[in-house]
Every structure is written in structure tokens, then in C-alpha cells.
Amino acid sequence: MKIQFDDPVFEAWTQRFLFTMPERGCEIGEIKTTAARIPEGNRDAWYQEWTATADRLSAEAEACWARSARVSARDLYMRASTYYRTSYPLLYGSPTDPRVKAGYAREAEAFARAAALFDPPIAPVAIPFEGMTLPGWFYSGGPGTRPLIIGTNGYDETVQIMHYGHAVAAQRRGYHVLIFDGPGQGRVLIQDGVPMRADWETVVRPVVDFALTLPGVDPARIALAGWSFGGYLAPRAASGEKRLAALIADPGQWDMIEAMRAMFLRFGVPSEVAKALPDVDESALEPIFAAIRRDPQLNWSFVQRGLWVHGVDTLTDYLRVCIAFRLSDRVGAISCPTLITAAENDPVAAFAGHLYDALTCPKTLIRFTAAEGAGDHCEVSARSVYFQRAYDWLDNVFGMR
């Protein structure tokens, strides 16, 4: 389904947040009319037009709030936040474009205004971490002691979008939910300039410490759920944080360098060269690097986003950083019940079976298919199918039925 653009990056980000529609995070008509105002390939216009739509909704939300129309104000702020979020990903890169910082600030502000209007309100939290704080939100599942789901992000998203990707569906089932952004994510990357790190157990440990100070959290029933690159980060965290009682990796991932080697093989790199990555002569890789830069989607994924997220300057440096992001030497330390997902058309899920096979803990593998509409990355075309199966699994693990 094409909405507007021939450029795959523009079109992907136009469609990106359609999955928020069931929770009133966007409207298809607003998306179509905004996209129609943007000339093909014009990134400045992209930022301007999505910002203009978000500004209009934000102003309308303020007017609704002034006349005590709380529900209308909340819904308008939520959609404004989504469109501010949409405004800046095409500008990713190092040094961080001031428009990325401004877009993120507006996104977070609109979400915060909406969060205060939920019943119960969604509570902002600041999690202490290595002399700074990690931004997050706490959702109460109701009175009494209840299990907690901690949601961890991946490469692309901000904590605000995890409202739709994790939190609301879990809260509806009676779970407390804590979502946060860590190094290399959201505000911590965009405004604080802190890049991604491999040792996610070091990040999650103080998050669990903080979670145990929240009202009504059952310390024996804490789950960690990661989506997108969180499908690496969450298992890595579970290998070193034993207070986690359940783990969800959506999708399951493996050593990052192995995924890169597989990609280079598809580009026609000889197998002996691919196996030696990253310790090969850079001149042998330059034709592949040039092909990556020519491809709009790959250039955005690896040059604009990847180098920026990891705080490196070259694709060779990126490959070297990948070595640290591995599970093969830690998977045996994961002891809690674990759910691994894999969507049929998701290349990020290519190594989900490797992770599942290597696990020695109680484990479940759920595959999502294109035929049921859930075959895309993180099942975003049918996220409710993910919620049904993943949270049914967790209900059984935690005795929520």
C-alpha cells in the first residue's frame, strides 16, 4: 500500500505510525494530506509540513483544554506528538541537526500534556543512571500489588512511541508498565548526546532498582520486553540481571556482526572476507560501502542513523562496534522464561531461531505470518496480534488468569 512517495525512506516514514491509530495516535487523512504537501525527496519540506500539521493540532488542543474539553485535548496532543515524531527522522546524522532536537522536544512536550489527561494520569519518571537520568513513563495497572512490564526500545523509536508499542495494551490487562529510553535512544541520544552501548544489563539494573520503588510493583513478577533492536538489548540485559522473571524479545536477535556478515554475503563479498569482518582491508569493502551510500534505505539505516546512534564516524568503525553487540557468549546465562518472536518478512528476525535454539531456559518461539497481516517488522501492521499472543504467554507465566 503506497500512500505518497517513490522514495522508500520517505514512504516508510509516512506509513511508520499507522499502527498507533487504534489508540488515537494518528489519523490516515491527516497523514495523507500532510504527505501530499511534500515534494518528492525534499527533506526540508518534510520537516516543515509535519511540524505544521503538529503545530495546528497542538494549538487546537490548547483551545480544547482552555474550555475544559479534556478528552479532545488529550487526543489532539497525542496526534500532535506523533506528527512531531514523524518530522525529524529523515534529518538524522552527526552532528545532530538542531531541527531533530527541536522536533524531539515538541514531541515530548505534546506527549507530556496528553499524559496528564489520562485517567489515571501517565506518570513521568526520571531514572538515575551514571550521573544523569533516563526519561520514562509509569502506567499503573490498578490498585494492589501487580506484575510489571519494563519496555525497552531499539534503534529508531522514542519512549513516547512505546505508549503504543507496549504500554497501553499491557495496562489494559492489569499490568503496571515502565517504559524508558536508554543510551543511544530518544532524548538520551538526541539531547544528551550519549550513544548506544552493548552492555544493556548495566542500563537495566538501575531501571529495576527504580522500578522496585514504584507503588504496587510485585518484585517477583518483573518482565522485560524489547522490540526492534530491543530484541538484542533485552536478552543481553536478562543475561546479567537476575531479578527479571520473564523476557520477551520481539524479534529475537543474535550477534550483530553475524547479521552484518550475512548482509555482506548478499552483496557478493567472498565468504572468506565476510567471515573475517571487521578485520579485513578496507579497500576490499569500499565497493560495498559505496553501494550502501547509493541505496536510499541502506544509507539512511547505516550512514545517517547507524553511525550517529553508535557515535562513530565511518562504516569501518561501525563494523568494529558491532563486535561488542553479541549474545553468543552470554545466552547461557539467561534463566527466566523467555519468549522469542519472529515475523515472516522481517529481515531483523533472521537470527531469531539462533537465539531460540541456544537458550537453555524455559522458552517459547512464536512466528507471525504475512498471511495473517503480522509479517512485518515488530508486527506493526497488526500489532494487536502481537499483543494477544505475547501477553497471553506472559499472563500464563505470571498467573494473571
Give the ranges of each region predicted by the language model:
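Alpha/beta-hydrolase active-site loop
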Residues: 194-216
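Short beta-strand/loop motif that positions the catalytic acidic residue
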Residues: 334, 340-342
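The serine-hydrolase catalytic nucleophile loop
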Residues: 155-168, 351
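N-terminal cap/lid segment of alpha/beta-hydrolase-fold proteins
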Residues: 50, 54-57, 100-143
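Catalytic histidine neighborhood in serine/cysteine hydrolases
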Residues: 359-376
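Catalytic active-site module of serine/aspartate enzymes centered on a nucleophile-bearing elbow/loop
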Residues: 369, 376-401
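Conserved alpha/beta-hydrolase "acid-adjacent" motif
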Residues: 345-352
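Hydrolase active-site cap/lid region
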Residues: 239-319, 342
